[in-house]
């Protein structure tokens, strides 16, 4: 166990400092993802890190949250996710504006329960929420945007990642119609992907009901193939048809978006959150045992805040996304050494040509400058010279005396 003195100057459990080049990559991916959101007209919002505990209703989320008390002894939570704070924001700040509201964000969230489960206690989510429309077109549109954002970050659909799409209302509706007394336990087991428990609970049911309880979670296949939905019709009598028709409409529109090949159907997917009411989806990436993103429709959540508006959206875990991206060659960086006016002018001129320049004022010898350049992942070292720059690639031979324009072409090329 670490001493109190050692703990005092270290990061807290589940958190870490992020250094270059990882921090640079994380911010670059965030920029690309937000750029796709903006291209689709989504407007960014920022909510407080602290919310009153009453804002978060779902027990699992409240249990996972970091808790503290304000001077009035009111319990506060560090936000464990972003959907509920945005639902509160819409009901509180946008109640007089016309829907739909298309909002985006990229903010840190905090969860105690995630420590040791593939996620830090503090991690960054980037996502969108569409509030005020029940149209399946918005479900399809957000899924298509999710695929587009992941592509912009550097993943390729199919080979690098797959969107797994389900319909929370279909399985839940089947259970509530057929075996309401066992439905909560079955839904809890399926949400936790505990198929052994699903099988155990199914044995207590009449054969026809047990067949659906076991069979629906096994309905998995490509979204471009109609076999899954055809098989699902066996379990749709008595009220499940509307959920399947909703799913068909979403798939048709995903085809119009050109994103159907990136989607796999799984009718056993009901989502991790209690508030999902319709289409629900998760994104899995090659080489990672955890989801990179998840989302779905939550038509009842805003009722808690006095605004009965339907909604849908998704969140991307940026740290997980960065962890599965292919390696990238670092951006070119030039360490320019010199403390006189000539060095300042050379740095300005190079930056004017688009060259990233780290200017070090001082008298570093070439060997010292190269060692420093390696420490900051720079590929080039330079010194100001009459008419241009003396330039050397790290680890290579002597210097070239080049005009600023030629030096810029060499560094950027």
From Swiss-Prot:
Biological source species: Rubrobacter xylanophilus (strain DSM 9941 / JCM 11954 / NBRC 16129 / PRD-1)
Domain of life (superkingdom): Bacteria
Subcellular location: Cytoplasm
Protein name, as recorded: ATP phosphoribosyltransferase regulatory subunit
Function: Required for the first step of histidine biosynthesis. May allow the feedback regulation of ATP phosphoribosyltransferase activity by histidine.
Keywords from the named record: Amino-acid biosynthesis, Cytoplasm, Histidine biosynthesis
GO annotations of cellular component type: cytoplasm
Keyword Ubl conjugation: no
PROSITE patterns xref list: AA_TRNA_LIGASE_II
Region (Disordered): 1-21
């Amino acid at each position: 166990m670490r001493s109190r003195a050692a703990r005092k100057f270290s990061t807290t459990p589940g958190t870490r400092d992020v250094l270059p080049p990882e921090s640079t990559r994380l911010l670059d991916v965030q920029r690309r993802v937000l750029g796709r959101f903006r291209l689709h007209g989504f407007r960014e919002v920022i909510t407080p890190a602290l919310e009153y505990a009453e804002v978060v209703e779902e027990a699992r989320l409240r249990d996972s949250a970091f808790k503290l008390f304000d001077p009035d002894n009111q319990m506060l939570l560090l936000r464990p996710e972003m959907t509920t704070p945005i639902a509160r924001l819409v009901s509180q700040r946008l109640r007089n504006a016309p829907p739909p509201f298309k909002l985006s964000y990229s903010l840190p969230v905090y969860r105690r329960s995630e420590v040791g489960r593939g996620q830090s206690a503090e991690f960054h989510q980037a996502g969108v929420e569409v509030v005020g429309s029940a149209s399946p077109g918005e479900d399809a549109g957000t899924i298509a945007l999710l695929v587009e954002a992941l592509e912009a970050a550097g993943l390729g659909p199919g080979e690098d990642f797959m969107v797994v799409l389900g319909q929370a209302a279909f399985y839940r509706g089947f259970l509530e119609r057929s075996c309401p007394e066992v439905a909560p336990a079955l839904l809890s087991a399926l949400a936790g992907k505990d198929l052994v428990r699903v099988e155990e609970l199914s044995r207590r049911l009449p054969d026809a009901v047990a067949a659906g309880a076991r069979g629906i979670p096994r309905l998995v296949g490509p979204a471009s193939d109609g076999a899954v939905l055809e098989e699902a019709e066996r379990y749709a009598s008595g009220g499940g048809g509307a959920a399947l028709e909703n799913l068909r409409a979403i798939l048709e529109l995903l085809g119009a978006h050109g994103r159907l090949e990136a989607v796999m159907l799984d009718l056993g997917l009901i989502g991790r959150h209690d508030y999902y009411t319709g289409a629900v989806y998760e994104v899995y990436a090659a080489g990672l045992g955890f989801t990179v993103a998840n989302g779905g429709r939550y038509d009842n959540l805003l009722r808690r805040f006095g605004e009965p508006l339907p909604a849908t959206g998704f969140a991307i875990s940026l740290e997980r996304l960065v962890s599965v991206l292919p390696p990238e060659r670092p951006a070119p960086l030039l360490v320019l050494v010199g403390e006189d006016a000539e060095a300042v002018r050379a740095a300005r001129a190079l930056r004017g040509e688009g060259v990233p320049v780290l200017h070090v004022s001082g008298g570093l010898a070439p060997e010292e400058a190269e060692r420093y350049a390696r420490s900051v992942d720079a590929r080039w070292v330079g010194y100001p010279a009459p008419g241009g720059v003396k330039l050397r690639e790290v680890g290579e031979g002597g210097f070239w005396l080049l005009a600023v324009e030629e030096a810029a072409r060499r560094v950027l090329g």
